[in-house]
Amino acid sequence: MVSARGILYYLSHPQELRPMIQWKVFHGLAHQRDEKNESPDVQACYYYLALTSRSFVAVCQQLDPELLMPICIFYLVLRGLDTIEDDMTLSTEVKEPLLRNFHTTIYDQSWTFHDSGPDEKDRELLVHFDCVAREFAKVKDEYKVIITDITKKMGNGMADFVVNGELTGVRKIEDYELYCHYVAGVVGEGLTRLFVEAKVAEPSLLENPKLIESMGQFLQQTNIIRDVREDHDEVRHFWPKEVWAKYADDFDQLVSPIPQNRQKALQCSSEMVLMALNRADDCLNYISGVREQSVFNFVAIPQSMAIATLELCFQNPAIFDKNIKITKGTACQLMMDSTQDMQHVCQAFRRHARRIQKKNNPKDPHFHDINAACNKIERFIDGRYPNLQDEQAKADTMYLVVLLLGILGVAAAVLMAKR
């Protein structure tokens, strides 16, 4: 039920309401789960997938049946790994062997873990991990090899950061990108190998690891920018000291509401946004190499959400006060764009890149570099689709005109009735 406040919001922001209605009414599923024929373990896997990420499960469940369970299991395995790494109640002595051996643990169909902290978001996944392991055992050997290899890479990478104490503060930019590689870049590698193995993506994608890496880096870096306040409150700092030390003596100054500190904090966030934004054209290049529609949706939606989130965070002091997220209307518009074709995905990227440019502050030390990164996105799109126009802007204008005419019509009718 929409509140009165919500109704007023959408009436004053009609560009938010239209995509929500379109998504609800017109969106069709590329594929659909056959829940009637699923075993209890399969249903349990989807249940825990939904607990870990509602947005991801919605996209995952529409995948081609060939990839549906392998990717579901892949995600749950890595989520289990991530849950161990994230748990601040576990000592390094407990974490390290769990992380390094997780690629063999997934073959134990009776393994469960009950020692996660009581407030750990995904502890139930580990408590009932045996159902994931049993379904993993049924996955094709070709997919099993890929999942095992990526789990080993990620587990060892996470363990290295835990042992070195990096999770309480990343020092250098190269450390930051290495961390993002282990928690997201290798995920992109695994997904690409699964896509190519299933013959739903161009094999040439595997020949360009830079594109694969950028897909993971773009998502993870955007999440780290958005979550800066939440991580600070948990005494975890992923923004590299090499960056933030240019703007503050300690990290507390960045999240301080004092005006002179806030200006420096925004300049720091601009540098963080710039690092992520420079990956955007690689992401578009990767997406264009995906053939099958459900897989296209699967890779395009998160990237479109990321560029929108990056735009929301850019020059936004609220990121230092609370966790922020894009609106439902924006999310629905992005999902509409990302489940059609490459041209619509490009329109979404162009739309948000232009908004970033519009928000760009000439007094910011990264002003010119931010503009250059946005122009790089424009050049990629113009190179692929030289005649592509931002039809969304035209559609929004037309919708506003129709709405205004409707309001004027109602007002005129009311006035006539009073005569």
From Swiss-Prot:
Regions that span the bilayer: 397-417
Any single Pfam family the record assigns to this protein: SQS_PSY
Record's bilayer topology term: Single-pass membrane protein
SUPFAM superfamilies: Terpenoid synthases
Needed co-factor(s): Mg(2+)
Pathway in which this enzyme or protein is active: Terpene metabolism; lanosterol biosynthesis; lanosterol from farnesyl diphosphate: step 1/3
CDD domains according to UniProt: Trans_IPPS_HH
GO biological process terms held by the UniProt record: ergosterol biosynthetic process; farnesyl diphosphate metabolic process; isoprenoid biosynthetic process
Keywords for this protein: Isoprene biosynthesis, Lipid biosynthesis, Lipid metabolism, Magnesium, Membrane, Multifunctional enzyme, NADP, Steroid biosynthesis, Steroid metabolism, Sterol biosynthesis, Sterol metabolism, Transferase, Transmembrane, Transmembrane helix
InterPro entries listed in its UniProt record: Isoprenoid_synthase_dom_sf (IPR008949), Squ/phyt_synthse (IPR002060), Squal_synth-like (IPR006449), Squalene/phytoene_synthase_CS (IPR019845), Trans_IPPS_euk-type (IPR044844), Trans_IPPS_HH (IPR033904)
Signal peptide: none
Subcellular location field: Membrane
Reactions listed under catalytic activity: 2 (2E,6E)-farnesyl diphosphate + NADPH + H(+) = squalene + 2 diphosphate + NADP(+); 2 (2E,6E)-farnesyl diphosphate + NADH + H(+) = squalene + 2 diphosphate + NAD(+)
Cellular component terms (Gene Ontology): endoplasmic reticulum membrane
Organism superkingdom: Eukaryota
Induction annotation: Expression is induced on squalestatin S1-producing YMG medium.
The enzyme's E.C. designation: 2.5.1.21
One GO MF term attached to the UniProt entry: squalene synthase [NAD(P)H] activity
NCBIfam families, per the entry: squal_synth
Family of the protein in this entry: Belongs to the phytoene/squalene synthase family.
Function noted in UniProt: Squalene synthase; part of the gene cluster that mediates the biosynthesis of squalestatin S1 (SQS1, also known as zaragozic acid A), a heavily oxidized fungal polyketide that offers potent cholesterol lowering activity by targeting squalene synthase (SS). Catalyzes the condensation of 2 two farnesyl pyrophosphate moieties to form squalene. The presence of a gene encoding a squalene synthase supports the identification of the cluster as being responsible for SQS1 production and suggests a likely mechanism for self-resistance.
Record's protein name: Squalene synthase R6
Gene that encodes the chain: R6
